[in-house]
């Protein structure tokens, strides 16, 4: 399945919704979306991964670096995910050292 990316920008939240397979071949699209997030004035960035069907190790590494860059420019990173196996994989990869997990974008708004 090809990767689909949707971006929504509100005053306080820049949201990137990802659906499909995230692998080395599809990472440029996500990289572009994350680059836009570094340029926004929104304090919070949400990366919604509930629509992912797979993610490979190369994509995890690139994602980890991108999230660290967002932290360096002062963005608070949220991973929206309800898939326990994916959350565990993100934790093992060290990605959650740079982000917080939320069940929904609505949960982010309440923080």
Where do the model's predicted regions map?
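STAS-like cytosolic regulatory interaction modules
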Residues: 1-111
């Amino acid at each position: 399945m090809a990767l689909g990316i949707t971006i929504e920008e509100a005053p306080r939240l820049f949201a990137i919704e990802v659906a499909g397979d995230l692998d080395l071949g599809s990472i440029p699209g996500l990289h572009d979306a994350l680059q836009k997030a570094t340029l926004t004035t929104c304090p919070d960035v949400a990366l919604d991964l509930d629509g992912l069907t797979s993610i490979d190790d190369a994509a995890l590494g690139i994602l980890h670096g991108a999230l660290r860059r967002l932290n360096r420019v002062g963005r608070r990173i949220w991973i929206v995910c309800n898939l326990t196996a994916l959350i565990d994989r993100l934790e093992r990869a060290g990605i959650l050292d740079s982000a917080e997990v939320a069940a929904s974008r609505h949960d982010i708004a309440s923080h």
